[in-house]
């Protein structure tokens, strides 16, 4: 009787341990530190350049900017290249609702980049844009 009880308890402990290990790996056992950062070559390979756009702001100022979009995969890069017209539309639409003082400074640019990333990601079916880089910026 005691031997059967010990075997049952041992089996239960093994099952609990296996479930715990599985949950650890499935639910994100990787910490941010353990995830490898992309090399610069990988970033460049998975990025899309958006040609310079000149448009009016809500405040009647003119802005000229160019951006680079970093994607999470080759598939999302390919899709993004096909959707370049939607990306340009998203940039122009966001800027049309923006005053010059809203986009000046680091905080304004970061807000614009986040809004643009969210809008572009809503179009994508394969992957996502991970980062938006402003590569040229001229506000008049």
From Swiss-Prot:
Record keyword Cell membrane present: yes
Pfam families noted in UniProt: FliL
GO cellular component, one term: plasma membrane
Keywords: Cell membrane, Chemotaxis, Flagellar rotation, Membrane, Transmembrane, Transmembrane helix
Any Gene Ontology biological process: chemotaxis
Membrane-topology annotation of the record: Single-pass membrane protein
TM stretches of this protein: 7-27
Coiled coil regions, renumbered to chain: none
InterPro entries documented for this protein: FliL
Protein localization: Cell membrane
PANTHER family xref list: FLAGELLAR PROTEIN FLIL
Function: Controls the rotational direction of flagella during chemotaxis.
Record family assignment: Belongs to the FliL family.
Name of this chain's protein: Flagellar protein FliL
Organism encoding this protein: Bacillus subtilis (strain 168)
